[in-house]
């Protein structure tokens, strides 16, 4: 009888653990996905339309230098090109890959944006490009993390 009670207790514990594991799979990351998407949307709109002051609010502290760098390299010719564009950049989040419970990568397609390639050269319009934007969750919010200025992903043929 003692053996059956122990076996029953063990099965009950395993069932409880399995249930907890299954329900925790519904949310394997911190923060809400809606908040993550909102961060990506707002950042993409600000950054790719050259509203760097707004983009600055959405990056982590280590990334601020990249936004400041981009803003410091805007010239009058760039401003004139931006004003001449019939509409601003548009974008679409293609996918989100959660790399851990507090980090993610958002894959974004950006269309009709003005790109600054090389410092000192004129910017040019890009019809479409894909970007991978890294994010991390800290202080109850998702933040964009930059290790350089965002660059288009290379196409694999």
Language-model-derived ranges and their functions:
Residues 1-23:
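Sec-dependent bacterial lipoprotein signal peptides
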Residues 6-7, 32-33, 82-84, 119-123:
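Intrinsically disordered, low-complexity segments enriched in polar/charged residues with Gly/Pro
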Residues 15-17, 29, 149:
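Extracellular/secretory pathway and lumenal proteins
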Residues 20, 47-50, 62:
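Residue-level signal for short amphipathic helical patches enriched in basic/charged
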Residues 24-49, 57:
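Short, low-complexity N-terminal intrinsically disordered segments enriched in polar/charged residues
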Residues 98-157:
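Exposed beta-sheet edge and beta->alpha loop/turn motif
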């Amino acid at each position: 009888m003692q053996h059956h009670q122990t076996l029953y207790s063990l099965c009950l514990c395993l069932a409880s653990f399995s249930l907890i594991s299954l329900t925790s799979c519904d949310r394997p990351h911190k923060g809400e996905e809606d908040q993550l998407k909102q961060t990506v949307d707002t950042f993409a709109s600000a950054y790719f339309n050259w509203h760097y002051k707004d983009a600055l609010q959405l990056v982590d502290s280590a990334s601020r230098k990249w936004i400041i760098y981009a803003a410091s390299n805007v010239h009058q010719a760039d401003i004139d090109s931006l004003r001449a564009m019939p509409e601003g950049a548009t974008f679409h989040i293609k996918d989100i890959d959660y790399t851990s419970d507090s980090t993610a990568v958002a894959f974004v397609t950006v269309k009709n944006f003005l790109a600054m390639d090389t410092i000192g050269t004129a910017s040019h319009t890009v019809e479409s490009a894909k970007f991978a934007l890294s994010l991390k969750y800290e202080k109850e919010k998702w933040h964009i993390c930059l290790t350089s200025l965002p660059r288009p992903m290379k196409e694999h043929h």
